[in-house]
UniProtKB/Swiss-Prot annotation:
Compartment annotation: Cytoplasm
Gene3D superfamilies on file: Ribosomal RNA adenine dimethylase-like, domain 2, Vaccinia Virus protein VP39
Leading EC class: transferase
Name of the protein in question: Ribosomal RNA small subunit methyltransferase A
Subcellular location, principal: cytoplasm
Catalyzed chemical reaction(s): adenosine(1518)/adenosine(1519) in 16S rRNA + 4 S-adenosyl-L-methionine = N(6)-dimethyladenosine(1518)/N(6)-dimethyladenosine(1519) in 16S rRNA + 4 S-adenosyl-L-homocysteine + 4 H(+)
Keyword Metal-binding among UniProt keywords: no
GO terms of molecular function: 16S rRNA (adenine(1518)-N(6)/adenine(1519)-N(6))-dimethyltransferase activity; RNA binding
Enzyme Commission numbers on file: 2.1.1.182
Amino acid sequence: MNNRVHQGHLARKRFGQNFLNDQFVIDSIVSAINPQKGQAMVEIGPGLAALTEPVGERLDQLTVIELDRDLAARLQTHPFLGPKLTIYQQDAMTFNFGELAEKMGQPLHVFGNLPYNISTPLMFHLFSYTDAIADMHFMLQKEVVNRLVAGPNSKVYGRLSVMAQYYCNVIPVLEVPPSAFTPPPKVDSAVVRLVPHATMPHPVKDVRVLSRITTEAFNQRRKTIRNSLGNLFSVEVLTGMGIDPAMRAENISVAQYCQMANYLAENAPLQES
């Protein structure tokens, strides 16, 4: 039997499709999401409705974003979910979550078993809409969840860690083995909860500057910041901020990256593009 076929649908590699089929895992994820009637619930990549069905049972209305035309068509004719669903057959990577929140009149509760081949760029896309999002629950590659929650002085702490924690409180929820999926992925998975900060713990004047600094620092993570960020900050400026120029990118806290971003925004602001 072809282990890429589940419920009559052939999993498409180009969409990174792995379908969840373990009932205990499904129940645990739905319990973590805790869907309530009246909430603006949005699922990314519903696939064969493993999460859509138990979440939809608790709701009067559910919005789903599904790129695969065949899967979107299956959902439209779903025997009991069909009437509850608003289906957007499009790419979540270009979806305007801000417009949807405005249309629904409240912040969104976003969830999904995300395709692992786009999970990191999709997270960055979602971070740009955190003003329109109440919370997010995602199944991701375990390695990505480890990066999301990592703190300084860790090998997996990187740009994703800094930007995720700048925008959100990040909480690991559950680890999931490959056997919970059809076809089984070659990696372990995990569920993570991201709750956008109601009040930013480390506000920055221009998030583009924070993005630039973290990109430059972590692209050269083995270098000291005296070297990797030398084109942006003098040793004197770093020392004046209480930041040791001999540290590497992975040694610098989210608060310190935000401090550097604010210095640069004040003293060498980016031009409007």
